[in-house]
């Protein structure tokens, strides 16, 4: 009935426009939208497109997670501090607050999100607000709200104001029936977590908005991301970050995945660079909306062996979490990212040896071992 009522408004509005000839006809069905707060059927849509010489005005949602602050730093070096606005619903630490513009942004508040985009003349939006795999399974209702309803709000605002939109996807978008070694860009996807389901929804909705409304939607399927200066956010690949904190603290680590569980991984600087590169890529070079990207693939035992080359006394034990193990076994072991490398020149810098050396150096482990020896 809601759709029929809105369709009636469209028909009536068309008739009135023909009769009066006083304004340009707007086709409101184009942006009926998917969010709870639908865009009015008689809305006029404005372009915030910028000249080639003008840097983009950037908004990052969910900016206090594992990737947001690092991405903001990278983009501010590229486009200027004042052109990149970090946002979240949490209070930022002092060093983040003073590093550049920060605003409160609740992606479930459609009106507020719209105001931020308009008031700050946003032309690029990086949507990082999401509950990750393990946390999402413990909070399915909240994950559904944040990962799906929040996405709908972002899609509608981006489409209305002609904003180039990036939303990350994940290895979690694949499922146990997907090819695992390797997983191509296009294959069957039947994930068994709310996080994975929401990311498949993201990929398909973004592609739909691209073809239906012309939204410049871009998406990368991230592998497990390893970062030195941020805490893991509740994902199944978190062990690959936690192991370095443990090595620095006491030289031992208890892993919640089995020793031979192979998953694709990437160092954070490669991840952030790939994100910027795909956003800057000319539209004509992109053959698809969602790309796999990858750098390396390893097991917990292989990571521990690489770590022992720097800290020979490091010890790893295993206490497997059945939930996380089941999730990991449903994910690809290797991602095929040949399309990203071919279309827009993706190339990673960090393999496992470089990753381990960088992480240990950040935590001071390599320095301490060198002094002891």
Swiss-Prot record:
Its EC number is 1.1.1.103. It comes from Mus musculus. NAD(+) binds at residues 62-67, 88-90, 106-107, 195, 199, 225. Changing residue 333 to A: Decreased L-threonine 3-dehydrogenase activity. Homodimer. It is an enzyme of class 1 (oxidoreductase). It holds the Pfam family Epimerase. It catalyses: L-threonine + NAD(+) = (2S)-2-amino-3-oxobutanoate + NADH + H(+). It is found in: Mitochondrion. One of its GO terms (biological process) is L-threonine catabolic process to glycine. Belongs to the NAD(P)-dependent epimerase/dehydratase family. InterPro entries: Epimerase_deHydtase, NAD(P)-bd_dom_sf, NAD(P)_epim/dehydratase. This is L-threonine 3-dehydrogenase, mitochondrial. GO terms for cellular component: mitochondrion. Catalyzes the NAD(+)-dependent oxidation of L-threonine to 2-amino-3-ketobutyrate, mediating L-threonine catabolism. The gene is Tdh. Keywords: Mitochondrion, NAD, Oxidoreductase, Transit peptide. One of its GO terms (molecular function) is identical protein binding. Changing residue 237 to A: Decreased L-threonine 3-dehydrogenase activity. PANTHER family: L-THREONINE 3-DEHYDROGENASE, L-THREONINE 3-DEHYDROGENASE, MITOCHONDRIAL. Pathway: Amino-acid degradation; L-threonine degradation via oxydo-reductase pathway; glycine from L-threonine: step 1/2. The active site is at residue 195.
């Amino acid at each position: 009935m809601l759709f029929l009522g809105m369709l009636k408004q469209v028909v009536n509005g068309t008739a009135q426009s023909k009769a009066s000839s006083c304004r340009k006809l707007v086709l409101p069905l184009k942006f009926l939208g998917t969010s709870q707060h639908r865009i009015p059927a008689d809305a006029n849509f404005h372009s915030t497109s910028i000249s080639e010489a003008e840097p983009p005005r950037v908004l990052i949602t969910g900016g206090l997670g594992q990737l947001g602050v690092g991405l903001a730093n990278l983009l501010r070096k590229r486009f200027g501090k004042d052109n990149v606005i970090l946002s979240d619903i949490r209070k930022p630490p002092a060093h983040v607050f003073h590093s550049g513009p920060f605003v409160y942004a609740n992606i479930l508040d459609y009106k507020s999100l719209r105001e931020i985009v308009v008031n700050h003349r946003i032309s690029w939006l990086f949507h990082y607000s999401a509950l990750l795999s393990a946390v999402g399974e413990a909070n399915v209702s909240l994950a559904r709200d944040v990962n799906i309803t929040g996405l709908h709000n972002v899609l509608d605002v981006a489409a209305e104001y002609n904003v180039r939109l990036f939303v990350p996807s994940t290895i979690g978008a694949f499922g146990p029936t997907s090819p695992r070694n390797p997983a191509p860009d296009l294959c069957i996807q039947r994930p068994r977590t709310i996080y994975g389901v929401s990311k498949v929804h993201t990929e398909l909705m973004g592609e739909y908005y691209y073809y239906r409304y012309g939204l410049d939607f871009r998406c990368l399927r991230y592998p497990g991301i390893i970062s030195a200066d941020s805490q893991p956010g509740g994902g199944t690949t978190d062990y690959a970050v936690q192991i370095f904190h443990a090595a620095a603290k006491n030289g031992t680590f208890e892993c919640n995945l089995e020793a031979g569980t192979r998953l694709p991984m990437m160092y954070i600087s490669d991840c952030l660079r790939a994100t910027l590169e795909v956003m800057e890529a000319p539209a004509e070079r992109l053959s698809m909306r969602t790309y796999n990207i990858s750098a390396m693939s390893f097991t917990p035992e292989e990571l521990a062996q690489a770590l022992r080359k720097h800290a020979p006394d490091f010890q790893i034990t295993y206490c497997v979490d059945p939930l996380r193990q089941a999730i990991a076994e449903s994910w690809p072991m290797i991602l095929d990212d040949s399309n990203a490398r071919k279309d827009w020149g993706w190339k990673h810098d960090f393999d496992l040896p470089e990753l381990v050396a960088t992480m240990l150096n950040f935590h001071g482990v390599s320095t301490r071992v060198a002094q002891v020896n």
